[in-house]
Every structure is written in structure tokens, then in C-alpha cells.
């Protein structure tokens, strides 16, 4: 078991030891996303329709008293 765990821990220490590699990955994703939008390419978003026909993208429905609104995730 120990020979399997040691290479995994070593790869994590090299990859994210100073946090720069992980931050660099986020920067790359942000650049690609921005380029996608600049060229007018659509970015697939999670959209669904609420009970009253309201369309919510990247959020959830809240329908008190049969009036639906979209609430961002995590709020």
C-alpha cells in the first residue's frame, strides 16, 4: 500500500506545493472563456424552465405564491 501512496503524495507536492500551478490553471481557463465570448461563440449554460414558464440559466427557481424568480446558486 505504501508504494502506491508515496508517488501520489509526491505528485501533489510538486504540482501544488506553492499554489502557483493551480492558480495558473485557473488563469488559463479564464483566458479561454474570455476568448470564447470575444469571438461570439456560445458557452453552454445550464438552463431550465420554472413552473410558470420563467427560464433560469445557471440558477435555481424560487416560486412562492406561483410567481417564479431565478436565484443564483449558493444564495
UniProtKB/Swiss-Prot annotation:
Key words of the record: Amidation, Cleavage on pair of basic residues, Disulfide bond, Secreted, Signal, Toxin
Distribution of this protein across tissues and organs: Expressed by the venom duct.
Modification sites for Tryptophan amide: 73
PTM per Swiss-Prot/TrEMBL: Contains 4 disulfide bonds.
GO CC list: extracellular region
GO molecular function: toxin activity
Broad class of where this protein is predominantly found: secreted
Disulfide bond among keywords: yes
Subcellular location(s) per record: Secreted
Signal peptide: 1-19
Propeptide: 20-43
UniProt similarity note: Belongs to the conotoxin V superfamily.
Entry comment, domain topic: The cysteine framework is XV (C-C-CC-C-C-C-C).
Entry protein name: Conotoxin Vt15.1
Organism annotation: Conus planorbis (Planorbis cone)
